[in-house]
A protein has these predicted regions:
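Short pre-catalytic strand/loop immediately N-terminal to key active-site residues, enriched for Gly-Thr
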Residues: 183-197
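Hydrophobic faces of well-ordered beta-strands that scaffold small-molecule active sites
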Residues: 77-79
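Glycine/threonine-rich flexible loop motifs
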Residues: 53-61, 120
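Conserved N-terminal subdomain of the carbohydrate kinase-like
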Residues: 1-51
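Active-site beta-loop-alpha junctions enriched in small/polar residues
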Residues: 22, 51, 82-86, 113, ...
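Conserved phosphate/ATP/ADP-binding segment of small-molecule kinases
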Residues: 87-180
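Conserved small/polar residues in nucleotide/adenosyl-binding loops
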Residues: 199-206
Length: 207
């Protein structure tokens, strides 16, 4: 079983996450153990995250097979980039592996840090030192456009935005771009939830 430990931050000291995922059942599975055509037989949507291909080369290959099968079967594929530097330890970089996988996804979720660290894409006109913990959503329209330009299969791009005031206070919002329209959520002040990860967008097909 893969587990993680959270050292909660205080005031200006950020929280720290420690991963213990080596030799977990999932990280050591063989790609040939799963029949993706059978698994996806009655499925309309496959969602994967960047945690999976980061765990091991076998896990990356399983993810690659799942996405390829979903593409062949006409199943919508969404991904959460979810970059975790500490997990990429088997000799391949996130950029090398994720570029191929994200290119075959129809919906991409991430934050500005994911896009920059994995793909080198930055929000135009954004200066983190000038934010004072507040995030201007319109600055990130360029991230959405750049990502969709790099990955033309993508039909929708979602960017989550967290402004860090201190270890105990964060602002939280998001933007969505569908290639034509740029949509923004309201901004929330989060004071009572540990920001280990974010709640994933629950995507539904438009009928």
């Amino acid at each position: 079983m893969g587990i993680l430990f959270l050292e909660t931050g205080s005031n200006v000291r950020p929280s720290q996450v420690y991963y213990d995922r080596d030799y977990s059942a999932f990280a050591t599975m063989s790609p040939n153990q799963l029949d993706w055509k059978e698994i996806l037989g009655d499925t309309r949507w496959l969602h994967w995250t960047g945690i999976t291909p980061a765990l091991s080369e076998n896990a990356a290959q399983m993810c690659r097979q799942a996405i390829a099968t979903a593409n062949e079967m006409g199943v919508t594929v969404s991904c959460d980039i979810n970059y975790r530097d500490n997990l990429w330890n088997y000799g391949k970089t996130a950029t090398e592996v994720m570029s191929e996988l994200v290119a075959k996804s129809d919906v991409i979720l991430g934050n500005e840090e994911d896009c920059e660290k994995v793909f080198g894409i930055k929000p135009l006109g954004f200066d983190a030192e000038q934010t004072k913990g507040q995030v201007e959503q319109t600055s990130f329209a360029s991230v959405c456009k750049q990502m969709m330009g790099r990955f033309p299969r993508c039909k929708k791009m979602v960017v989550t935005l967290r402004g860090s005031i201190n270890a105990n206070q964060n602002t939280w919002s998001g933007v969505l771009y569908d290639g034509r329209t740029f949509m923004q959520s309201r901004s929330y002040l989060i004071t009572d939830i540990v920001a280990v990860s974010y709640t994933h967008l629950r995507a539904h097909e438009t009928r």
